[in-house]
Amino acid sequence: MDKYVNGSINNIQNNNVLEYTINEINQYPEDVLEVAIKLLNIRYDPNTIKELDEHNKNNTEILGNIWLFSLNKLPLKERQLLLKYGLWELGAELPTDKLYRLEDAITSILGWSFWEIHDPKEVVLKLVKAGEMLHQQNRDIKIGEIVGEEFTALHQQNNDFTMLHQCGEEFTALHQQNNDFTMLHQLLHNIQDNSMIEDLCNKIGERANTLKKSYKNDDCKKTAKIFTILTFEGMRFDEFMNKAIEQLKIGEGTLKQHLKIYKQLEWIDIRKNPEDYDRKYIYLTYKFYEDIKDILDEYLPKKAFQEAEAKSEFMEDLKKSLKKFIEERLTPEGFEFDINEVDRLKGKERIVGAYFRSLLLNEPYEAIEMIYKVYYEKYFQFKPLEINIIGLETLRSRTIMTKAKDWGEFRNKLCVFRGDIAGIIHHRKSRPILRRYVCIDLDKNGNNKGCNCEVIRLYEPVENSQDYKIKCPECGRDIKYSESLFKDEDGEPIKLERDLTIAIIQLKETDEVYRVYLPYTPEINNLRDVEIVGILKTNHKGEYYIEGLSINPQKTINFNYDAFVRKVKNAGYSNALDYIKDRVFYEVKAILDKEGKNPTIDTLITLEILASSHIYWDKNRDGHLKPETIDCLFIGSYGQGKSLTIEPLAKLHNTTEDMIRVDMPNIENLIGLVISRDNIKFYKKGIIPMNHNRPIFIEEMMDFILRVGNDLDLLKSGKTSGIWKREREGYNIPMIGVSPWIGVGNIKDIDLMELWEIYHLKGFEEFKEAMINYFAKKLLKQHDYDRNEAEDRAKKIVNNILGANPQLNASEWLLSKILDFTLKNLRGMTDRIPLIYLLKPYTNEDWKEIKLHTYKVKRLREDNNFIKQKNLEAYECALFISYIKNKDIEFKEDALKTLWEVEEKLRDLLRDYGLFKGYSDRLFNQIEYMAKAYAKLKFKEYVDLEDVRDALKIWFKTILGVLLRIKAPDKVKEIFKLVGEEIKETQQKDEELEEINKLIEESRKLSQLKREILNYMLQNPKIYTTVEIAENFNISEDTARGILKELWKNGDVDNPESDQWRPL
């Protein structure tokens, strides 16, 4: 067949070539596809077309006829193939002034292309491309009508109105030579009812009158129709005036008066256009859309509005333009923007640039978010280069970051790393968002030789950043950093806080460990076989690290239960509980009881195995959050090891599929750690956990109530950061398991010792007055209030607290022993929390040991073998827990019967203390599940009496359990006898009671000492040092410094210089 094709070309001047070629195709139908493709290739060769054109002006028409004939002769599959690689793929590149038969080709193919091509939308996109090209060549072939008809049929068969709408609009816009369909034009396109358009314009006019109250007498409804004329691209002012006066039938004076109103509303912009001899032009602004969007919503049909919003909405169009605007100014090193550049732009880009300049100055957060989004889309969403750096033998260093000079060829390149995640570090970085550089070059006389050009750049963490220079885009001078324009309400530079996850990757077949920086990591799986796509970079020391872009798990490791049991027993353990403690909770060895145990850890592990509890949301009462149960809660002052105790739980992942999810890093700033069936979540302070699964632990006193109490109106508005918006309608916000020893919630700068002192006050009114005075002092220190205003706000806060905690009202106030009060005060929480622990305070000597231990653990983390070994073992423990959670286990008959008897006895005991049935049922379920968990941890197939006894022991280690043992020792003794366990007679000198009393006594002594120090400083006002206070009161410097810091937080003293204190 080549000879026929070549013959056609060589003899193209022969007038019979068309007839000759068609006859040959009929003679060899099996090769028609090959002939057609070759003819197509010839047809697209510019040199060939040029040569053919010299011989015969009709050559392209002849080739077009051959093309159409071959299409009609081809079978369906070949036509699809030819169409895919033919006309639509290269249509925009055709010299259309030569192809006289292109219209016929499009028309003939349209009849079947939508039904026979696999993806009709692909054809639509090609038609759009071809249509744009034809429109540019002024080839009016009424493509919109053709496409509209075909898509009407498509709509009838496939119910695909979206494609009809999109393609029809596209070609109609091209055909009408109007490429700027604004939102209002789109509205008019969808609304054909003139009365509806009239009504819409009336409402726009009413909105203008409402916004501009000083013009109440001016009826803007008369001129609102001008917005059907205006576009973003603008039009000459004189042409607009003539057109508007003609359509509105009003005088020029009235129109100009209303234009003045619209300009003050920033709905229009009138300025000179340098491209048109500085003639005045009038433009429609984006603010117009923002102000009337709710009106448009009323008139656009829902589906049409969604389509129009997705395609032509003002802000969407603006964001697309801004994205392109930003992309053009991005470099791999960062983002650069010259403020003065806007004035040099033209057309629509100038409008976008001006908007972006305004956005930078007025809404820098939004502008920076957009820059970062574009940056990551541009540089962090491309296919990884196939550079295998795993097998390089230059990786010999055993440090976290490796100096490998031979890696220079891979620096700043996208690479693929394959290995295991050997550890995770979470922290938050804060840095200024933007920096401003101004071209200022002062001579000796103080005159500026610079051009005052301003350049805004993203902050770059370079050394000596104040001296960091860039080139002026105007005059080429070196310009320095100037004070940032972008400041918050307090005048401080706006900073960008970024949650940063650092994953430690263990490369395969090597012993090397590298840092992987991930700017946003919703989920990382420990020790999964992963592929990390990242850019290899170096820091200023020449050390290599990976700026990770993505982490993709490669496979799931299967768990062998029998092998794990053998491993535990071979290691000398009779159960998995002790094995897990030693492998996972090695960091909390310092927090042990006198027997060298930590029952809290036992509880946490067993609770981790349970899957029974959850939270539900009660939406019927003002949208308030109502937890059904919280499994475990700790109570204690700062620094008592609560976070240190539970942090290792992050290593006990629940499932292999969704092992760990970290929403907020940095343990110091957390309100709690929530364990659910599928994930582990960290929550930032002040935030109510929005999790439908069960929380196990919530800790720390933060600033929630104080922050809300400062501005109750702000709470109503729902704008308070960190407050769940469904709570905004009321003040009675239930705190989920936070600080229940006062039943209040989180209060800033108050620790447990202060609160005990407040609660020792006799009588409700005295307590209330003490709380009001305390908050008033706080508000005076933290805000610019006078005394009366601070007291009024403090009263609102206290009333808010009392309203949210009915157990603190006057009728419930107890004047008996502190333990009675504690039990009564805990009732608000104990109906939902079976396990509550009171952590004892530690002495300075204890903390020295804990800090030393923590330091050793930190050093050990840097040892690769230690990281790998410990994390592998933690991972195996996680898989074991995940496995036994789903493993069913039954009670032995005697154990089940005994458990029922225990429940009956315990129910009577709880009823004496006013705990309702619902709580009792949940508690018994917990004991039952805990007994099963203990049996599973001991690799048993059935639950026996020993497991029931272990579950009871854990429960009676809690505050409520201890108090029940103190109040009713005989009944508790009877309960333990049922499971064959003897307990000592519980007297007032019970060990647990002594610890609680010791805590209370220490709290009283410290509070008394704090008052004495403050009174002494007030009576002898001067500047004191910490050493002076320590010597005067015969206490250690650490204790004195701690008390002085508390007084400083409360606003009683200030701190003029380091380690100096002055009474206020």
Curated annotation (Swiss-Prot):
InterPro entries: P-loop_NTPase (IPR027417), WH-like_DNA-bd_sf (IPR036388), WH_DNA-bd_sf (IPR036390). Gene3D superfamilies: P-loop containing nucleotide triphosphate hydrolases (3.40.50.300), Winged helix-like DNA-binding domain superfamily/Winged helix DNA-binding domain (1.10.10.10). Disulfide bonds: none annotated. Signal peptide: none annotated. It comes from the Archaea. Keywords: Plasmid. SUPFAM superfamilies: P-loop containing nucleoside triphosphate hydrolases, Winged helix' DNA-binding domain. This is Uncharacterized protein MJECS08. It comes from Methanocaldococcus jannaschii (strain ATCC 43067 / DSM 2661 / JAL-1 / JCM 10045 / NBRC 100440) (Methanococcus jannaschii).
